[in-house]
Amino acid sequence: MKKYLILLVLVLLTGCGRDKNKLIMVTEAGFAPYEYYEDGDIVGVDVEIAKEIAKSLDKELVIKDIYFDSILNEIKSGKADIALAGISVNEERKKEVDFSINYITSRQVVIVLKDSNITDVDNVYNKKVAVQLGSVADTYFTDKHKSTELVRQKKYLTMVEDLKGNKVDAIVMDELPAKEIVKKNTNLTILDGYIFEDTYGIAIKKGNTELLDKVNEVLNNLINDGKINEYVIKYTK
């Protein structure tokens, strides 16, 4: 029997009466190479990590695919145990949930059309920029660059269509998923440089120190053994 079960639903699971033998991971599976669909299953770097966490707890992994801006609420309400979705750690999010140790360092990069007149990342601030709703890019521009006209979307694929349709001038998003998008869309390119760096952590309900300690133990082992780098290589081939 598989140690993980994928629920391809966008509905809420009730927090009460949950099976104690299941570890519920919440994610947004449109973020390759970290989590995405392949032949009907959700796969990726974060999924591999979650499998190891579930294995260490002797539990069955259940993966819940929802919109990114709802993920932390699922953790806060107890409807999910862990959240892995390329979640950048910042002070605002730390007020809502606890985070594991950092396990990935990322950069926020800029995608444009190849024939765009935007040639430098510093040129995007007075442009029309697509960001994922609730992402650190959303927060960054909202707080620090109010002159930027933001188009907030729930899905990266929608942002790509907006860019290709000239509805926005650029997309700002995480580097590895941006590279995956550009691989599949040859009329797009990533500008040299980046907007800012960020780090990913696993979100857990505040006060659940037992689970947090176990997650950190697993992450430390994976990092020290070079496994996370192996997962990244595996899913970016």
Task: List PLM regions with ranges.
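Flexible hinge/capping segments at coil-to-helix
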Residues: I101, V112-V129
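Extracytoplasmic small-molecule ligand-binding "clamshell" domains
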Residues: K20-G86
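C-terminal motif of bacterial Sec signal peptides marking the signal peptidase cleavage site
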Residues: L12-G15
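A ligand-binding cleft/hinge motif common to bilobed small-molecule-binding domains
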Residues: I87-K95, Y140, K164-G165, D169-E197
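Ligand-binding clefts/hinges and TM-proximal coupling segments of bilobed small-molecule sensing domains
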Residues: V136-K154, T186-Y194, L219-K237
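Short loop->beta-strand "edge-of-pocket" segments that line small-molecule binding or catalytic clefts
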Residues: L23-T27, V121-G134
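Periplasmic-binding protein-like
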Residues: T27-A29, I104-V112, E175, K179-N220
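Short helices/loops that flank or line small-molecule/ion binding pockets
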Residues: S56, K64, D69-I82, E96, ...
